[in-house]
Amino acid sequence: MGPSSAFLGVLFLSGTLGLTTSPARGRLRCYTCSFAKPCDPVPRECREDEVCGVSVGTSGRTLVRWPFSRWLLSFLPMAAAATSAFLFCPTEQKEEEVIERKGCLPRAQCPLLGHATYWSRSYSLRHQCCEQDLCNAAASQPPPNLPLMTLLPLAAMIGWGVHDFL
């Protein structure tokens, strides 16, 4: 067995194992769409240092509402309502809006948090990255509803007869 046979054997073995002799790998193709709804994704080729990603942005806004404020305004004179409003504790209600965009992201940006402004509103971004062709097709799932997640185990415990032990 000569040197040329050994070289051909190594070349065949590296091809079988999926190793390539050229440094150029194919670039990823990712779906791309902006924050606008509905998202109609369009495939696009990324740059060498980019991966596919889904960026999910949340905008938390706190609204302060005074309990019984409508009742006070309708039944009491305006002056009395204005002076009595401080007697009631305000309630806070979080109103969160979620936006999403897909596209190519620099690999180094994946673990980092980001910020974006969309329609004059500020959003905190989290990135979910993947490294296969068109792997960012699926929509991200919204966070679970906290009251629902609390009630479901309680209902299951009652249904299974655990209420006897409580």
Swiss-Prot record:
Cystine residue pairs: 30-52, 33-39, 110-129, 130-135
Q: Where is the protein found, in the record's own terms?
A: Cell surface; Cell membrane; Cell projection
Enumerate the UniProt keywords alphabetically: Cell membrane, Cell projection, Disulfide bond, Membrane, Signal
Q: Which residues form a coiled coil?
A: none
Origin superkingdom: Eukaryota
Q: Sorted alphabetically, which SUPFAM superfamilies does this protein's record hold?
A: Snake toxin-like (SSF57302)
Tell me what PTMs the record reports for this protein. O-glycosylated. Contains sialic acid residues.
Q: Would I find Membrane among this entry's keywords?
A: yes
Subcellular location, principal: other
Gene3D superfamilies for the chain: CD59 (2.10.60.10)
Q: Which InterPro entries match?
A: Activin_recp, Ly6g6e, Snake_toxin-like_sf
Q: Which GO terms describe its cellular component?
A: cell projection; cell surface; plasma membrane; synapse
Q: Which residues form the signal peptide?
A: 1-18
Q: Which Pfam families match?
A: Activin_recp
Gene Ontology MF term list: acetylcholine receptor activator activity; acetylcholine receptor binding; transmembrane receptor protein serine/threonine kinase activity
Residue ranges of domain UPAR/Ly6 in the record = 28-151
A Gene Ontology biological process in which this protein takes part is: desensitization of G protein-coupled receptor signaling pathway
The note filed under miscellaneous reads: LY6G6E is a pseudogene in humans.
Q: What does this protein do?
A: Believed to act as a modulator of nicotinic acetylcholine receptors (nAChRs) activity. In vitro potentiates alpha-3:beta-4-containing nAChRs maximum response by increasing peak current and slowing down receptor desensitization; the activity is dependent on its cell surface localization.
Subunit structure, as described in the record:
Interacts with CHRNA4.
Record's protein name:
Lymphocyte antigen 6G6e
Task: Identify the species of origin.
Answer: Mus musculus
